């Protein structure tokens, strides 16, 4: 997950480690997973996985009905909450702003091949599996 990628259109070819940006985003208690996309793209985007129990408790306090990870992550108010959290992370990386994001509609799972044995996201697997979501951000 820490493999550096090039952001030539953003930074004049400077290599940036996506894990730095991802870790910054994951300081939010609401965000469990952040996969930053930027290789050969005009701007940075991210796939976000929520911290289900914490977001679920937040949603219950806001009277947001939900029964599954999917319908919680698809809820507009939850997406607004996550965007606010991304904006907070963006304040710390002024030249590397996440401009768009999409919510993962299921938790990443080691058994599905999404995570390593140490529970780290497998970037290439996730980028292949969620390529439709990624392409949607760059249309």
What positions do the PLM features span?
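AMP-binding/adenylate-forming catalytic core of the ANL superfamily
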Residues: 1-96, 107-112
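Short capping micro-motif at the N-terminus of alpha-helices
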Residues: 18, 123-124
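A short N-terminal helical cap/helix-turn-helix that marks the beginning
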Residues: 90, 130-139
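General small-molecule cofactor/ligand-binding pocket signal
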Residues: 101-104
């Amino acid at each position: 997950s820490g493999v550096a990628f090039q952001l030539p259109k953003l930074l004049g070819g400077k290599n940036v480690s996506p894990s730095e940006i991802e870790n910054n985003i994951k300081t939010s208690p609401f965000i469990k997973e952040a996969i930053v996309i930027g290789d050969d793209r005009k701007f940075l985007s991210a796939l976000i996985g929520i911290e289900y129990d914490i977001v679920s408790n937040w949603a219950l306090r806001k009277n947001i009905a939900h029964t599954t990870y999917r319908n919680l992550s698809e809820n507009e108010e939850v997406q607004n909450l996550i965007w606010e959290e991304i904006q907070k992370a963006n304040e710390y990386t002024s030249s590397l702003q996440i401009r768009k994001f999409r919510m993962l509609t299921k938790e990443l799972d080691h058994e599905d091949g999404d995570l390593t044995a140490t529970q780290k996201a497998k970037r290439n697997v996730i980028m292949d599996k969620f390529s439709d979501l990624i392409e949607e951000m760059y249309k």
